[in-house]
Amino acid sequence: MAAYLLAVAILFCIQGWPSGTVQGQVMPFMEVFKRSVCQTRETLVPVLEEHPSEIADLFKPSCATVLRCGGCCSDESLACTAVGKRSVGREILRVDPRKGTSKIEVMQFTEHTDCECRPRSRSGVDSGKRKRNPEEGEPRAKFPFV
């Protein structure tokens, strides 16, 4: 048994870990650079961030994956910004705790299609957060009682 475990350990050292890099290996500069540039990347977006008026219901999952712009620009005065967008549908389970009902429905999310490094807003910080309309009320608690 000990010989088997030793063989498996040696095999991992020779072939590398499943991620494709040997544990402790340094990622080459070009790979780091390629992964860090301003581009669309899969991002988890909370359902209530896209649909803030739907606070009375619960959603499963509570977030969905969409492509969003992210990454670094060559200058601190620039921010990675979406220049192309589209609407995409995701199937989400909506639970109405008042009625005790649930149903799977298609909800629309904004997905970024193209990104560019553009000058940051005048405030100097581009938070990317959407401003809440006063008529929408207060946001729902993060851990509602169910």
From Swiss-Prot:
UniProt keyword Cytoplasm present: no
Signal peptide: 1-24
GO biological process, one term: induction of positive chemotaxis
InterPro entries, sorted: Cystine-knot_cytokine, PDGF/VEGF_dom, PDGF/VEGF_growth_factor
GO cellular component, one term: membrane
PROSITE patterns per UniProt: PDGF_2 (PS50278)
Pyrrolidone carboxylic acid found at: Q25
UniProt-listed Gene3D superfamilies: Cystine-knot cytokines
Gene Ontology MF terms: chemoattractant activity; growth factor activity; toxin activity; vascular endothelial growth factor receptor binding
Intracellular or extracellular location(s): Secreted
Record field: compositional bias (Basic and acidic residues): 133-146
Domain of life, per lineage: Eukaryota
Disulfide feature: C38-C80, C69-C115, C73-C117
Tissue expression profile of the protein: Expressed by the venom gland.
Function, in words: Snake venom VEGFs that may contribute to venom dispersion and prey subjugation by inducing vascular permeability and hypotension. This protein induces an increase in capillary permeability after intradermal injection, in a VEGFR-2 (KDR) dependent manner. In addition, it provokes a drastic hypotensive effect after intravenous injection. The hypotension is mediated by nitric oxide (NO), which is produced by VEGF-activated endothelium NO synthase. Also induces angiogenesis in vitro. Unlike other crotalid VEGFs, this protein probably interacts with VEGF receptor-2 (KDR).
Family to which the UniProt record says this protein belongs: Belongs to the PDGF/VEGF growth factor family. Snake venom VEGF subfamily.
Protein name in the entry: Vascular endothelial growth factor isoform GtVF
Species classification: Eukaryota, Metazoa, Chordata, Craniata, Vertebrata
